[in-house]
């Protein structure tokens, strides 16, 4: 077997095979993607122009919105245009690029969610020291660390993948470049590469989830000493973040804990976290947040004027 790349182009099977169903998906998912761009952009603008939103919590939220735009744009535009294409192709280099950036922005989002949980912990459990602990310099370092963590993770994934030989077949059973599906096309045994990739992603997920759960466990314990009104106010600031964490982690856990033979269901779940969740996050964060809603209204008024 020649240890070289004869494959320069890959073919996606897509989400569905029926052309009519694909057209319906195009009509549904295009507005969802546009809503993702609009909703997250509004949060970015609102946080940047509103003086009432110049706090660490909203700084992290605006950073999360930027990542949501980038992550969604890595996968969704190609997916949407492919819904109208008879043959869904991507170059091998393009596939590797998509893998790099999808893992990059995905891990940045995970770490940012952990940072936001820590921010809530400090705000609720150490309110008198909040501004000293969460200084502007610390906030910028935490966000920079999130981006650095995502970069290191993606570099590891891509360094493992690039040397693999691909000499055919060239069909990926997905609508975007998934590492596990790409490994199946390699003309060599990829057990070790697959193990390293899963360990890399799994370690980040487990550690992040542990910190998230621990942070909110400490918060809940500390709230036992508060009044009913104090508990209500504190929990209201955490509810949106907890919802977003659930939306992010549950679909991923569903995919990686199911047998590999149920891949059709996995593709449908992938639609949720690549297409739907980035649109829902701005809604979740603004639905019960009066300050954010007022800031967005002000940004619209300034735009109209």
Curated annotation (Swiss-Prot):
Extracellular side of membrane: 1-25, 77-95, 163-202, 258-266
InterPro entries from the UniProt entry: GPCR_Rhodpsn, GPCR_Rhodpsn_7TM, Olfact_rcpt, Olfactory_Receptors
Cell compartment(s), UniProt: Cell membrane
Purpose of the protein: Odorant receptor.
Record-level GO BP terms: G protein-coupled receptor signaling pathway; sensory perception of smell
The keyword NADP is annotated on this UniProt entry: no
Positions bearing carbohydrate: 6
Gene it is expressed from: Or4b13
Cytoplasmic topological segments: 47-55, 117-141, 224-236, 288-305
UniProt keyword annotation of Glycoprotein present: yes
CDD domains cross-referenced by the UniProt entry: 7tmA_OR4A-like
Membrane topology: Multi-pass membrane protein
Source organism of this protein record: Mus musculus (Mouse)
Name this polypeptide is given: Olfactory receptor 4B13
Keywords for the protein's UniProt record, in alphabetical order: Cell membrane, Disulfide bond, G-protein coupled receptor, Glycoprotein, Membrane, Olfaction, Receptor, Sensory transduction, Transducer, Transmembrane, Transmembrane helix
């Amino acid at each position: 077997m020649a240890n070289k790349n004869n494959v320069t182009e890959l073919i996606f099977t897509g989400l569905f095979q029926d052309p009519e169903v694909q057209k319906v998906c195009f009509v549904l998912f295009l507005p969802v993607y546009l809503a993702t761009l609009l909703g997250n952009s509004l949060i970015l603008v609102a946080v940047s122009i509103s003086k009432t939103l110049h706090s660490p919590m909203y700084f992290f939220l605006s950073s999360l919105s930027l990542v949501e735009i980038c992550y969604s744009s890595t996968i969704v535009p190609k997916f949407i245009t492919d819904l109208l294409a008879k043959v869904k192709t991507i170059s091998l280099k393009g596939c590797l690029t998509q893998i790099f950036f999808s893992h990059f922005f995905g891990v940045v989002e995970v770490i940012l969610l952990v940072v936001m949980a820590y921010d809530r912990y400090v705000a609720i459990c150490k309110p008198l020291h909040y501004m000293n602990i969460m200084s502007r310099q610390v906030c910028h370092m935490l966000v920079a660390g999130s981006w650095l963590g995502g970069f290191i993770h993606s570099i590891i994934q891509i360094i493992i993948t690039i040397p693999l030989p691909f000499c055919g077949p060239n069909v990926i059973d997905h609508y975007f470049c998934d590492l596990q599906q790409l490994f199946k096309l390699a003309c060599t045994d990829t057990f070790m590469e697959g193990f390293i990739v899963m360990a890399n992603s799994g370690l980040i997920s487990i550690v992040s989830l542990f910190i998230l759960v621990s942070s909110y466990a400490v918060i809940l314990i500390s709230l036992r000493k508060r009044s009913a009104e104090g508990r209500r106010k504190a929990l209201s600031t955490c509810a949106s973040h907890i919802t977003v964490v659930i939306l992010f982690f549950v679909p991923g856990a569903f995919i990686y804990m199911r047998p590999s033979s149920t891949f059709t269901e996995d593709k449908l779940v992938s639609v949720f976290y690549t297409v739907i969740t980035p649109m829902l996050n701005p809604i979740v964060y603004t639905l019960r947040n009066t300050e954010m809603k007022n800031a967005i209204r002000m940004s619209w008024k300034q735009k109209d004027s």
